Amino acid sequence: MSGLGKRFVEAGYTDLKPFIPVDGKPMVQHVVELFRETNTLFICDQIHSDKLNTICPTSKVFHSVHRGLGPVDAVMCAESVISDEEEVIVSYCDYGTQWDYKTFLADVREHLAEGAIACYKGFHPHHLGPDCYAYVRENDKWVNEVREKTPFTTDKMNEYASNGTYYFRTGRIMKEYFKSLMETGESLNGEYYVSMAYNHMIAKGMRVRVFEIEKMLQWGTPYDLEVYKMWSAYFHEKPRRRLRMPGITLLPMAGQGNRFRMQGYDTPKPFLPIRGQMMAVAALRDLPETDSTTVISLKSHAVGQYFPGCKIVELAETTNGQATTCMAALDDVDDNTPLTVTACDNGAMYDPDRLENLMNDGSVDVIVWCFTNNPTGKLYPHMYAWLDVDDSDSIREVSIKKPFATKPNTHAIIGTMFFRKAGVFKAAYKHIVDHDLRTNGEFYVDNLLQPLIEQGYSVKAFPVDYYLCWGTPNDYRTFLYWDDYHSSSH
């Protein structure tokens, strides 16, 4: 804990990184509670002492001066107070973990390992981004090599990565190989990382074990922490009242779901499970209730049994876009009927009072639901339509599947729109067909917006509090990951 947490300071945090609140308690307290040990040594600046004594009253604090040489150097500054004979775990202070500590200790002791690294492998959402960590090349859970900040393959998710927990059978072993690392000058950007000491141990014939954890909670950067806090806040939210709105809801779900099929999903995307119900049903239940609902689906999907009380429009084949799919259900809908169009692959949590006020404003012709805070927009910016919004939430411009080059990309469409009159939708659709206004060769509902804005219609953005994207395999897996974590007793 001798680092300065510079990125968090630059991001505007006033608390020192280890003491930033996460789920109601300081970040470092989560780390301390992973081990449930009484013999804990904090290596940190003197100003941390009082807070640390509160978090772990049985702990000791070694005051160090920040030298910028990394965690190995910080630990070696305190070598005089670390026992040579006892087991030692060196842990970073900026992560959470779902695991069984007793099983970890039993495993390393049973296998007589001189060292061990707690690792994760497979799908973990923070690995979707560009950041890299400490990676392990292993055979049958025995480490062959460790590489810091650089994976061994192009598929980093399927390599073991360290969570920041490092075990040594004795303090003597740890000190010897920390010294060896520093003597060889093997640093990265001027810092000596704990993980790299294991290569020196392995070269001398010592055995280093991999222990696989269940979940890795990455809090090491402001972005990582904000992503975690967003998901945590959503899963701790209480249910909100469901609005009642006039008109009809259209749920088009007549696509092929190619991205899911290419990744081995046999079940069509709208039928995949979300918290015990079908994805498309979950999407509808997050919306206001309207007078009626029409589901537009491929005939081969036979969806009628899943939507009792809804009108079903079956198509023989896919259309040239979502907007065209919607038009297949609008022939017998009066032009003055309010219309809500939504996607089948996302959920949302929103302020019902704010939406109700917007609905009651008769001057607003179109309401576009959007998000401002979901990491999927940063990871996949070219998959969204972006909105240029003024201070009153009026939309000035729409850029579809292409972020703005000279404007901030703060608002992205989530796939739900309200048209005060179905006739406005129909006329806008005719306009984009007549002018061949497509995106990626298709007529999207998003394509209707820019012509309506240019024709003088009042088109407003409605930012939701939480956007739940299930539209791609990675988005779907991300939701399931956090749902599983927050549903379990961790």
Residue ranges and their predicted role:
Residues 7-9, 13, 21, 25-103, ...:
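Conserved N-terminal catalytic core of the sugar/cofactor nucleotidyltransferase
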Residues 19, 135-138, 210, 271, ...:
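A structural signal for short hydrophobic beta-strand segments in well-ordered beta-sheet cores
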Residues 66-72, 123-126, 216-219, 317-322, ...:
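A short acidic, often aromatic-flanked loop/helix-cap motif at beta-alpha or helix-coil junctions
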Residues 76-77, 103-104, 197, 227, ...:
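Alpha-helical elements of Rossmann-like donor-binding domains used by nucleotide-donor carbohydrate transfer enzymes
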Residues 98-185, 349-435:
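Conserved core of the sugar-phosphate nucleotidyltransferase
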Residues 159-249, 335, 410-490:
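Conserved alpha/beta core of the MobA/IspD/sugar-nucleotide pyrophosphorylase nucleotidyltransferase superfamily
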